[in-house]
Amino acid sequence: MTAIVCVSLLSEKAVLVKNLTDHVKAFYESIIGRFVSGPDTITEKRTMDSVIARKIVPSSTVILDGYGESFIRENPNATLMDIVTSSNNTAPKTTYQSIMPAMSALLGVPYVQGAFRHGIISKHGGKKTSLIILVVAPPSGFIRAASVGSSSSVVEVDSNATIKLDDTVGINSAMIKNTKLVSAAGLTAMGIEEIPIKCNSLDSLIIGWSMKYFKGYVDGYKSGVRDQATTILLNTPFKDLFVENGAGRMLPNDSFRVSESTIKNQVIEMGEGTKPDALISTHGDVFIDSEAVFTSDEQEKYRKDKDEEFFKKCVCNHIIAGDYGNNVIIIENPPHSDVRGLGVKYSFQVNKPELDGTESNGIKYYSKDTPQQIHDAILDVISDTNKSLLMNSKPIERTGKEAIAVCFKNGFPKKFAMVEMEKNGVKIVGMGDSPMLVLDNYPSMLSRAEKANRKSSRAKIDAPVVKIDTEDLDTNTLLDVIKKEVGSR
């Protein structure tokens, strides 16, 4: 069953309150429509026969509305953790690859890949810690055309939506007409039968990573390893996070603030000659210079007086205000009482007075020979600290042996973590990405159209195929099987 996947970002200041501009609202409503109530069954005439169609709600779609202001207003004592642990949060089976980017732009939030990266970076961060929520429910405007199978059964969902979700051409046109997005955020037209094929590897990537991280977030909370600021936010009732204004709108409660002692930011302390500007320019979505958020008055005063205490005070104030966001702060002399170091200081000095692993003020000191080696090592440390860190929607690539490209013939099993596979040198690729090995794993439930399309796609793969049942294998055993098969060829 087809689905649209939309990710909701929860932060201490917003619980999926969509900021749709006026010129987008009409388009948004034309897609989601409103569910039309009526009888549970519909009698439909087909030539000489009448078929009883049972109205059902699709179970494997992700709602576009999510939890908005009405939910907050109706559940003032609920918390973010109540949503996180909801049994409704299960992964959908398929994804509309072509619509996802447009929906993310329309709602003003990154879709799962971007949001996932954001969440990982902010997991150990401070005030603006964000959380991924996949809210599973049917979008009310979802329309599936009635069809008659061998059992003469018909499934149909009533809706007054003016745009069908399978009409990507219509959505594309409406997007261009009603939004300011260039080229409609990359929407492309495709037939319904093409979607499962084109989205197979994308599903595994996005849903697999998201749900693993999502479950890890909850597990971390239960085991007590969550940083204090995040724990507070997850368990604060909505009535404390939001207040209702005179116009009946739910707005962030500015008087609510996480205790300053719980707010931490990650920092990298770099020595002279390590070229932090190059690191910031290359990975601006991850790193930020400590002075980048200073006001003009603060910058002028610091450059004039060179007062280190004033500098530290400014850094702390901006951390508390959340001005650094979720970025890792590059700083020369961090105020250790108010920020948490990543555990590294890199410098290359002729005498190298600091031995690798030397610890001082909670920060370990290391030495490297060139700025590039320093930058590579820093990325390694961040990758180790945030196990699933994504940069530019791709995992950080480690230097060394080439990753083993593996294609799962019947889709990547959701029981495994794709991040863990890539961390151990196994890259999961799609049908047309020249895999080194194809695993004919336990077959999924496929329609006849899917089987036909998969058969034609597989014929193009020039790689050894190994039949394997992944049902009873753990990650380590599967990795051993893959490496053994590749090593023997």
Curated annotation (Swiss-Prot):
It holds the Pfam family Phytoreo_S7. It is found in: Virion; Host cytoplasm. Probable component of the transcriptional machinery present in the inner capsid. Displays dsRNA binding activity and may play an important role in the sorting of viral RNA and virion assembly. Together with the RNA-directed RNA polymerase P1 and capping enzyme P5, forms an transcriptional complex positioned near the channels situated at each of the five-fold vertices of the core. Residues 129-251, 321-351 are annotated as: RNA-binding. GO terms for cellular component: host cell cytoplasm; viral capsid. Belongs to the phytoreovirus protein P7 family. GO terms for molecular function: RNA binding. This is Protein P7. Coiled coil: none annotated. Its main location: virion. Keywords: Capsid protein, Host cytoplasm, RNA-binding, Virion. Disulfide bonds: none annotated.
